[in-house]
């Protein structure tokens, strides 16, 4: 028998009632959430924090006159700590694990804390020594720890252990982790600032950290642009170096670097062109925005500003020619060491060569010996700093040398242009020259008796220049020397020593120094780059260009030339008496009279010098001074292209280093098959 429809009615009513109750409860809950607690949950939903991180721009390149890279960038990897990603991981334990990975791979880590590892008794010592940066760093650490500046190393380490909760680690690990934590503090590690634990890490470290990423929260492998030098032996002193910002740089001028957009762990040019053109090379950093909610969950991450690479700095230097000039200098020094007797060049051990484009003042090459490999600079700095003679000194721009007889053309120019002598007037070369009670002599090589200026330069007659110098006057020939380029700033971009001339204000001045200074002795000290500028000015018949090595700047992205550096005339000496012609004839004669340059296929102009050093050898009547060697040269005389200056310490005299000039001329004028170069060094290819 079938049920009647009315038998189902109670069930339907019950279901409707239950559904109504559920609906009412849902609506009440919705009202509660939306109306009563709405503001609370709205605030919670909006409780996110936005963080911005720098994306470092690629550094601009430095290239030679043909566009060949001298300083460039390669892709590398850094190990970075990101506090946003650390989560609940213990920072100290994470750092310990990462250091163990770095140690296994032979990688170093970022810790400049000047405190030693514990000794056998568990004591520590400071390692700051005479290093100002380390001393400043140590002072900052003590201040941060609330210690007095006289606190001992043990007291500092105790404070570090307490502050960074390192009590449960062994002493060796307390030092390692404490040093890293101090470094992190000094670099403002926080949710807003990442910390670079290690730079340029090995592939092994990269792989290991990635494999263990789940247990190493907060540790990130970051691809980065790293500075590299295709041939680190080319222009190391000039290119300079980059390094992390030092704390004293960071706090200087009320944190000026921060206002310019730097982060404390950024790289910055430390020396050379890298420092001088930091603003052009650095580029514009980009920006990464990370949004994190109140539970610490990353909600979004996006690049909001793309980084823009720095500009390319173009030089006047020809990298291949530079290598040949460097080789010419080194080979000559080694040859002198191996072939010359003691006291006559065997002791040669250091020097410099500078080669200029006569028509522009652009530096085509600048070599210093001894030198170093820029790619190994950081790793070998301590050894380099301890060597004598120092490879770190840029002798071409900062080495100060007595010019000796290479100074005589300046005295000749002063005498001729001031009417004290003429191209044909003579001085009687008879020993000794008498100036009050001072009686210097002349070696009289190849001459004696009456001699005019051109032959006096050819044979390097001392008495001619004693007399001309005295009659012209110290101040007058000094002024001429400076107009020609000696003992003044030449204009080279990376910094240079000014040097000095002998003056009446010198503490040791006596009237005899007027005589000695006229042959480039006394107190006069100049640099090789000044000597090259001086030679170029003589080649240009009195027109002195500003010496420079930067040719211009180029947009790295588009290749567009942004700026070119045009030749600048610094001085023009008016010559209505044929002074520079007479000087040139004398220097041509000197080239013919010097064995190494006597048969050169082009007509070249040369003046050597053999300035005496203060050091002596021998005893009694056999006592004598050691000599440096100096040479200035230019050529071809008919249409001068390049000017050369070379100085070699302890080389025994200018004639001993004249081969350097020959080798440099050969490298410029001829290719390796001894054929005439169709493309001269320093000439941009079309």
What are these regions (language model features)?
Residues 89-100, 199, 207, 211, ...:
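Solvent-exposed, polar/charged alpha-helical surfaces in well-ordered, non-transmembrane soluble domains
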Residues 323-355, 371:
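Beta-lactamase-like hydrolase cores
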Residues 1-306, 339-352, 358:
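Membrane-proximal periplasmic segments of bacterial cell-envelope enzymes
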Residues 561, 662-686:
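Short, gly/Ser/Thr-rich active-site loops of penicillin-recognizing serine hydrolases
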Residues 651-660:
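A short acidic/glycine-rich loop-to-helix N-cap element
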Residues 71, 77, 291-310, 317, ...:
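Beta-lactam-recognizing serine transpeptidase/beta-lactamase-like catalytic domain environment
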